[in-house]
């Protein structure tokens, strides 16, 4: 059952939303955070485990150096300060997903702190301040059996899979985001999108929200206009898409607005986002005073990255998405809308590689964001996995440019390339798809169509040359789209002049 909601504009008239985002990034390391177990969580349950990630007595952890390097690179990309000295801590809690009854995380000494990220939303640039980015391990996975929708409520029993326990995470926490007004959910979505693109550019994570590589907990409260007193916040979990981040925040803003308009209090609690119905439901009540009894991890030495190493990692950072977008937008003369659609489709690198292979930017964009994007969506794969390379797209466009193919024939060539029939030229040869420009073959078809359409032919003789389009269409149909339309038009006008 959904809650009563206050219209969004009414909420904005009286309240200022304050947003905070906690984002967990699953790192693409081969092994777990503190042991040598594989991070492949798709294996049979409880097969990628060992005494360390199960927390068995006497086991000793050792920190994953690759995870530390990834954390520093993330911090640098987010304009953070990198701690000269930090350490891990034990976050104590009791729940079946962590057998040792504590999570190894960081508390008051994160590896990265005080950063920022500029994001664009609705044609404006907003700065999101980042409080910290710290390292921690993931928990195991619960499977509740016998309940509804996999929830613990009504379940007869629960199963635990610890393959995920100990997988390296980076948690990125923003400072309270204020002053955005009605655009708060939109800016949060843009922040998540840019964060995802940065992780992919760095190569530290697959950053697939639908697969749990990138997980967001969205906090929001309402502050009365003209007041500096923060309202009671809720934390919405289970937000697994960019659209859901925006939708969950907007829903919570309207839900809280209704409660406050009725003189009721907002309860500080976790909420769960329901994707199907696009609403939140109550989880558990929370308190700012929750005591996890943090204390320094005694089994791990402190981390002290040298300044030389940090500066080396800074120098080796790849071009980040915002800089690449600005550079390519200028080079290609794309509109803001065109660049945004390319970024949102994850096509920027593909477009750049296609242009580097000799294709014009506009043509590269046309193929990747229309025909190939549609085929990728139908197949349920990423655009890069659709079955056609940037070089092949450039080859395809060259065949169009030199008159060998029409756009319609080129679409058939795409089908052939994806089906594994070879490069574009091989598909053209194998399927016999080249445009027919031979006057003898075209002339015969033109004569037949003129003879079959005397009234249209008479109009053309009378000076209505635009009527030639009807004859061209029939000829293209007869020749299965392979006729050179320009030459067909010339022949029609020559014969009827």
Swiss-Prot record:
InterPro entries: Asn/Gln-tRNA_amidoTrfase_suB/E, Asn/Gln-tRNA_Trfase_suB/E_cat, Asn/Gln_amidotransferase, Asn/Gln_tRNA_amidoTrase-B-like, GatB, GatB_Yqey_C_2, Gln-tRNA_amidoTrfase_suB_CS, Gln_synth/guanido_kin_cat_dom. It catalyses: L-glutamyl-tRNA(Gln) + L-glutamine + ATP + H2O = L-glutaminyl-tRNA(Gln) + L-glutamate + ADP + phosphate + H(+); L-aspartyl-tRNA(Asn) + L-glutamine + ATP + H2O = L-asparaginyl-tRNA(Asn) + L-glutamate + ADP + phosphate + 2 H(+). Keywords: ATP-binding, Ligase, Nucleotide-binding, Protein biosynthesis. The keyword Glycoprotein does not apply. The keyword Transmembrane does not apply. One of its GO terms (biological process) is glutaminyl-tRNAGln biosynthesis via transamidation. SMART domains: GatB_Yqey (SM00845). Its EC number is 6.3.5.-. GO terms for molecular function: asparaginyl-tRNA synthase (glutamine-hydrolyzing) activity; ATP binding; glutaminyl-tRNA synthase (glutamine-hydrolyzing) activity. It holds the Pfam family GatB_N. Heterotrimer of A, B and C subunits. NCBIfam families: gatB, PRK05477.1-2, PRK05477.1-3, PRK05477.1-4. HAMAP family: GatB. Belongs to the GatB/GatE family. GatB subfamily. Allows the formation of correctly charged Asn-tRNA(Asn) or Gln-tRNA(Gln) through the transamidation of misacylated Asp-tRNA(Asn) or Glu-tRNA(Gln) in organisms which lack either or both of asparaginyl-tRNA or glutaminyl-tRNA synthetases. The reaction takes place in the presence of glutamine and ATP through an activated phospho-Asp-tRNA(Asn) or phospho-Glu-tRNA(Gln). This is Aspartyl/glutamyl-tRNA(Asn/Gln) amidotransferase subunit B. The lineage of its organism: Bacteria, Bacillati, Actinomycetota, Actinomycetes, Propionibacteriales. The gene is gatB.
């Amino acid at each position: 059952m959904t809650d009563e909601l206050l219209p969004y504009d009414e909420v904005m008239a009286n309240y200022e939303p304050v947003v905070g985002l906690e984002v967990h990034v699953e790192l693409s390391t081969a092994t777990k955070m503190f042991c040598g177990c594989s991070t492949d969580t798709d294996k049979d349950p409880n097969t990628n485990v060992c005494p360390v990630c199960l927390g068995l007595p006497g086991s000793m952890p050792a920190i994953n150096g690759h995870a530390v390097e990834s954390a520093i690179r993330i911090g640098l990309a987010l304009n953070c300060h990198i701690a000269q000295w930090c350490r891990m801590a034990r976050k104590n809690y009791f729940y079946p997903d962590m057998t040792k009854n504590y999570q190894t995380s960081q508390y008051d000494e994160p590896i990265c702190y005080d950063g920022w990220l500029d994001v664009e939303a609705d044609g404006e640039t907003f700065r999101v301040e980042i409080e910290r980015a710290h390292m921690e391990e993931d928990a195991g996975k619960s499977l509740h059996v016998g309940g509804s929708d996999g929830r613990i409520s009504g379940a007869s029993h629960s199963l635990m899979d610890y393959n995920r326990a100990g997988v390296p995470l980076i948690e990125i926490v923003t400072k309270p985001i204020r002053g955005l007004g009605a655009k708060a959910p939109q800016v949060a979505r843009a922040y998540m999108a840019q964060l995802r693109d940065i992780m992919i550019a760095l190569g530290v994570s697959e950053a697939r929200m639908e697969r749990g590589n990138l997980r967001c907990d969205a906090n929001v409260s309402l502050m009365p206009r003209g007041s500096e007193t923060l309202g009671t916040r809720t934390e919405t979990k289970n937000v697994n898409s960019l659209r859901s981040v925006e939708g969950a925040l907007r829903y919570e803003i309207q839900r809280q607005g209704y409660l406050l308009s009725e003189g009721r209090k907002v309860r500080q609690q976790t909420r769960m986002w329901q994707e199907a119905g696009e609403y939140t439901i109550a989880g558990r009540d929370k308190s700012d005073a929750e005591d996890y009894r943090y204390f320094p991890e005694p089994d791990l030495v402190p981390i002290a990255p040298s300044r030389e190493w940090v500066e080396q990692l800074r120098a080796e950072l790849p071009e980040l998405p915002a800089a690449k977008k600005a550079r390519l937008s200028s080079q290609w003369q794309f509109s803001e809308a065109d660049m945004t659609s390319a970024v949102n489709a994850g096509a920027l690198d593909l477009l750049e590689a296609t242009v580097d292979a000799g294709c014009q930017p506009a043509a590269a964009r046309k193929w990747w964001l229309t025909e190939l994007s549609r085929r990728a969506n139908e197949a349920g794969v990423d655009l890069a996995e659709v079955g056609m390379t940037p070089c092949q797209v450039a080859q395809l466009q060259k065949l169009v440019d030199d008159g060998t193919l029409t756009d319609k024939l080129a679409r058939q060539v795409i089908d052939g390339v994806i089906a594994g029939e070879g490069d574009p030229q091989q598909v053209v040869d194998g399927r016999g798809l080249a445009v027919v420009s031979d006057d003898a073959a075209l002339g015969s078809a033109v004569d037949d169509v003129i003879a079959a359409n005397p009234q249209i032919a008479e109009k053309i003789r009378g000076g209505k040359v635009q009527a030639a389009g009807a004859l061209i269409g029939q000829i293209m149909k007869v020749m299965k789209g392979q006729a050179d339309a320009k030459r067909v038009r010339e022949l029609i006008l020559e014969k009827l002049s």
